[in-house]
Design a protein with these regions (language model features):
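Membrane-interface loop-to-helix entry segments
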Residues: 36, 47, 51-60, 166, ...
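N-terminal alpha-helical transmembrane segments of multi-pass membrane transport
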Residues: 1-89, 99-106, 117, 443-467
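Transmembrane helix-loop junctions in multi-pass membrane proteins
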Residues: 47-52, 91-95, 178-190, 213-225, ...
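Selective recognition of specific alpha-helical transmembrane segments in multi-pass small-molecule
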Residues: 116-124, 204-219, 230-250, 283-286, ...
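Flexible loop linkers connecting adjacent transmembrane helices
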Residues: 50-75, 97, 103-104, 119-161, ...
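Alpha-helical membrane segments and immediately flanking helix-loop junctions
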Residues: 69-101, 127-130, 137-153, 169-172, ...
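Helix-loop-helix module between adjacent transmembrane segments
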Residues: 40-45, 116-141, 150-187, 191-215, ...
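Extracellular/periplasmic helix-exit of transmembrane alpha-helices
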Residues: 124-136, 242-258, 272, 302-305, ...
């Protein structure tokens, strides 16, 4: 019953809302979320005058911001938290799923989603910083879409409200999404460890839940652990990929040719496969970099910075790191393997086969450990996101905060034995609903963030004149 309901909602969000006929009898299926996300990304890229490229140096400089309150987070720490969730399941299992279903061309559309999505990420993170509030439970600040949606509707109606329906729907969708992701985490880690070490999934899941509980049930341990874990795991994965690319440098041009050909190739269009290529690239790009979904603003709001746009710059950079760098690493690992060796494989089995081809048994062990670290950091990150949404729904009390953490731990356990397709669908449903509520409000509130960007650039220009 529940599985059927999830599948029906998934079909509405991610299924083909429009069918565009193509030469040769095929068609391109366009989902509701693509209709929302792609125009939003293009619109904000135009309105910010190509911010991801034009202001890339400012994104890097924004990471050097200092903080005065020990309970608040620096811009760099909020990047770490958001990167923990971005550089996680989507970068490994998500890329595998995209390429398996949509071919190499899906990688190109993941890149496009990231480039235009960076502008969307800037807008939503800047809004979160502008509408943040003090957090009486954890200290520092909190916020996110539930909060800026609330402020917008209060401002429009002129009435003070305890809760706003759209904010409530967003917060509930977020909690559903993060429960779904919790299941994906244990499901994928358990399968990976079974393939690499022949450890029964139940044992792996139990250990994962215990380790997570030790950290998340403590007040402020999450950020401290992520500060150490995320840079280490990302750098290790990046350099292993560089080694693989260097040792297969002769095949690299062919990989890029294949990506471009399958992204636009006549074979895909005539066969009607272009829709699958586009859909899987965009869908997994969103699941990985979260631009427009409203997740990362929950971290952006926690930053202590002198200008709201700096929080926006930080999250725009996070999208670049996630998709252009880390997701590309996974894609290269897969696409540098002869296609016949990967035939008939899916999920982590496919990725581990690719790593075994490149690095032997060490590759299988490395990707299993990497998946564990990526997944563990993702779980910690999504529970950080959940804080502000739980507080919005249930108020400032430790009972509700602890209850959701326990629920997420239960979902983490259940995911180890759940069906692979169902747990992905649950996560996709949650992130899809979040994206609908958030993207619509971004069109309405985006002008606020754009005005902050204009003020920032005017001040920078004035400062240059003085110097």
């Amino acid at each position: 019953m529940i599985v059927n309901l999830i599948e029906r909602i998934y079909g509405f969000l991610w299924g083909d809302l429009l069918q565009i006929p193509l030469p040769g009898g095929g068609s391109v299926g366009i989902s509701l979320l693509i209709i929302l996300l792609i125009p939003a990304g293009i619109y904000f890229t135009i309105r910010t005058r190509g911010l991801p490229i034009r202001l890339f140096p400012d994104m890097v400089v924004a990471l050097t911001g200092k903080k005065d309150d020990n309970n608040s987070l620096s811009t760099f720490q909020t990047l770490i938290v958001s990167t923990a969730t971005r550089v996680g399941m989507g970068n490994l299992v998500g890329v595998v799923a995209a390429v398996s279903a949509g071919g190499a061309g899906a990688v190109f559309w993941m890149w496009v989603t990231a480039l235009i999505g960076s502008s969307t990420a800037f807008i939503e993170a800047t809004l979160a910083q502008m509408h943040k509030e003090r957090d009486p439970l954890y200290g520092g600040f909190r916020g996110g879409p539930a909060y800026y949606i609330h402020d917008y509707i209060e401002g429009r109606t002129g009435k003070k409200k305890n809760h706003v329906l759209v904010s409530v729907l967003f917060a509930v969708s977020g909690l559903i999404c993060w429960c779904g992701i919790s299941q994906v985490i244990s499901n994928s880690v358990a399968a990976s460890f079974e393939n690499a070490f022949s450890i029964p999934p139940l044992y792996t899941t139990i250990v994962l839940v215990i380790l997570a509980a030790v950290i998340v049930l403590r007040k402020n341990a999450t950020v401290k652990v992520l500060d150490l874990m995320v840079p280490f795991m990302a750098v290790c994965y990046f350099f292993i990929t560089i080694f693989i690319i260097v040792t297969n440098i002769g095949s690299l041009p062919g990989v890029f040719v294949r990506i471009i050909q399958e992204a636009f190739g006549a074979r895909q269009v005539v066969a009607g496969g272009f829709g699958a290529v586009l859909m899987n690239g965009v869908k997994r790009g969103l699941f990985s970099n979260e631009a427009g979904s409203g997740s990362a603003p929950c971290a952006a709001a926690a930053a202590e910075c002198d200008k709201p746009v700096k929080a926006g710059f930080t999250q725009a950079l996070g999208v670049f790191i996630d998709t252009i760098v880390i997701c590309s690493c996974t894609a290269m690992i897969m696409l540098l393997v002869p296609e016949k060796l990967l035939a008939g494989k899916e999920g982590m089995d496919l990725l581990q086969t690719a790593m075994k081809y490149h690095l032997g048994e060490f590759g299988v062990i490395f990707i299993a450990v990497t998946l564990f670290l990526f997944s563990f950091s993702t779980f910690l990150g999504i529970l950080f996101y959940a804080r502000s949404n739980v507080a919005y729904l249930f108020g400032d009390n430790w009972a509700s905060q602890t209850a959701y953490k326990v629920l997420a731990l239960v979902m983490l356990f259940i995911g180890g034995i759940a069906a692979y397709t169902f747990v992905w669908d649950l996560g996709d449903v949650g992130i899809g609903l979040m994206t609908i509520f958030n993207t619509v409000i971004l069109y309405l509130m985006g002008g606020q963030a754009l005005r902050e960007l204009k003020k920032y650039e005017a001040a920078r220009k004035e400062q240059k004149k003085k110097n």
